Amino acid sequence: MKNKDYPLRSSMDELSTKNDNEIDLEKGPLPEYNSEDGSTLPPYSEIWKYIKTVSEDSSTGPTEIANPNVERRQEFKDSHPNIYSLLRLLISVLAVIVVFFTAWVCVNPLEKSIFGKVAFSVTIGITCPIVFIVIFCFFETWTQAVAQCIKVTVIFLAQCVKVTAVFLAKCVKVIAVGLYNSKKDLVVTIWLAWVVICFILFGCVKDGRLNLNKALICSTCSISAALFFILLLVCIPIWTLKHMLFGLFQVLGVQSCVVIVTKGLMYLFDKHIDATGYEIEASSLFVIGNFLFFYEMERPGALKRMPKFIGNGIASFLGGLGNAFGGIGNAFGGIGNAIGRIGNAFRGANDNNDIPLGEMDVESEV
């Protein structure tokens, strides 16, 4: 019998041997791993990679966030050193000049005594070089400080503006809600103020102390427009701007119609537009404005319904006139019928008077 020799290595051993013989061209041959030393790890293991990354991060330390403005300034300084130095010198000289002239204007040493002039000269002689040295030598430091101060100031002002705008918006909202809830009392107050203003204007014009002429009607229209603008702001919610403007234009339209009709009547009756004409015109607007004012106050939204109301009123008026004329016609018809009946009665009486006497005797005997 022949003895068969079987290999003592398994397939896993062959695979590991094959992997050991292969060399990674990027990493190079693997160094020998000392299993007896517990502190040594394979250089390409995952734990080794992690430890190496952490050690590199700790050695470099925390990275600072670069300021783009500082980087740009440093780049400009490195690329143009002469221009940068000249700029520093120019700014330093300008600062010294500003300090000198400010001190000169505030103190005015020419009006001082000799001791005052000497003190001023010594003070300026010490202050100006210090200012020049500080600005020139610490240019980057104070420019960064000024830039940071400006940035903080701008942010603070923006926050103040934002807070103020929010506060004013809330105040306007609260005032609008308050006006809407207490509109009747406020409307009466506005109306009384408007009446007082109009009477003051009319009184001044009447006494001759104020010669407005054409300005009178314009001022009256302006007062009326402002009044109804406030009125519509109060009676109608503030966010319905379309309805408010619609009502305002309606009031102005009514006032314009009154002005046109008044002037037309004055020209029709050969009445020239003078002070009296303007008083009549303004009084008409005053009466119309008061009527519309109270009507709108008692029935909010009346101005919006005014065209339909006027149309219905005109239709009702014409219908009433038609019914009146129809009634008058019916009355005249009734009178005609009564007159006809009276005529028939008279005709019957005349027919009875024309009967002969012999026929009357026969009828009586029968």
UniProtKB/Swiss-Prot annotation:
Annotated Basic and acidic residues bias: 1-29
Single GO cellular component term: ascus epiplasm
Biological-process GO terms, alphabetical: meiotic drive
Region called Disordered, residue ranges: 1-39
Disulphide-bonded residues: none
Membrane-crossing residue ranges in chain numbering: 89-109, 119-139, 149-169, 185-205, 221-241, 245-265, 275-295, 309-329
Keywords: Cytoplasm, Endoplasmic reticulum, Membrane, Toxin, Transmembrane, Transmembrane helix, Vacuole
Pfam families: WTF (PF03303)
Function: Promotes unequal transmission of alleles from the parental zygote to progeny spores by acting as poison/antidote system where the poison and antidote proteins are produced from the same locus; the poison component is trans-acting and targets all spores within an ascus whereas the antidote component is spore-specific, leading to poisoning of all progeny that do not inherit the allele.
Family to which the UniProt record says this protein belongs: Belongs to the WTF family.
Assembly: Homomer. Forms protein aggregates. The two isoforms can interact with each other and with themselves. High sequence similarity is required for their interaction.
Protein name: Meiotic driver wtf4
Source organism: Schizosaccharomyces pombe (strain 972 / ATCC 24843) (Fission yeast)
Gene transcribed to yield this protein: wtf4
